[in-house]
């Protein structure tokens, strides 16, 4: 399974979604634009998407949920260790109030992994983010040893994806 992402204006991305209703397309609002995500076993219908292989998942994507996309940079010599660490995280995410879905994504190009956490709303996510589970497994401090010394990669950061009707 692959997850493809592309950013643009609400109108442009919504037209893509309307023209391809047979596809698994999900549109969200960010602080400064809109984003469309496509989950697919094959090629994307998006023209120039960022492409990721889904290497771990729980739950289903839903446009009515709040998502946090965490961008985790790494270097070639740390990729396997980062991936192994994240795949070995064995935590009961479903036990967190409001939890809906999780995706661990490996880039098809580049060296920045993504982690998507889906929750019923931002408050439920913030509660999870304050937990020991998050801080010990997904925080910048927990993952910084896998970033590598190279300055060629991006930095660890989060981007919030809001349901269109809520933002």
Curated annotation (Swiss-Prot):
Q: Which residues carry this modification: Phosphohistidine?
A: 65, 78, 153
- Recorded source organism is Staphylococcus epidermidis (strain ATCC 12228 / FDA PCI 1200)
Output this protein's name.
Answer: Signal transduction protein TRAP
User: Describe its PTM?
Assistant: RIP inhibits TRAP phosphorylation.
Residue ranges annotated for the ABM domain, each copy included: 66-157
Q: Which family does it belong to?
A: Belongs to the TRAP family.
Instruction: State its location(s).
Output: Membrane
Segments traversing the membrane: none
Q: Indicate yes or no for the key word Phosphoprotein.
A: yes
InterPro entries linked: ABM_dom, Dimeric_a/b-barrel, Heme-degrading_MO
Give all cystine bridges in this chain: none
User: Does Membrane count among this protein's keywords?
Assistant: yes
Any further remark recorded for this protein: Down-expressed in ATCC 12228 compared with ATCC 35984.
Coarse class of the protein's main subcellular location: membrane
SUPFAM superfamilies given in the database record:
Dimeric alpha+beta barrel (SSF54909)
* Entry's Gene Ontology cellular component terms: membrane
Q: Which UniProt keywords apply?
A: Membrane, Phosphoprotein
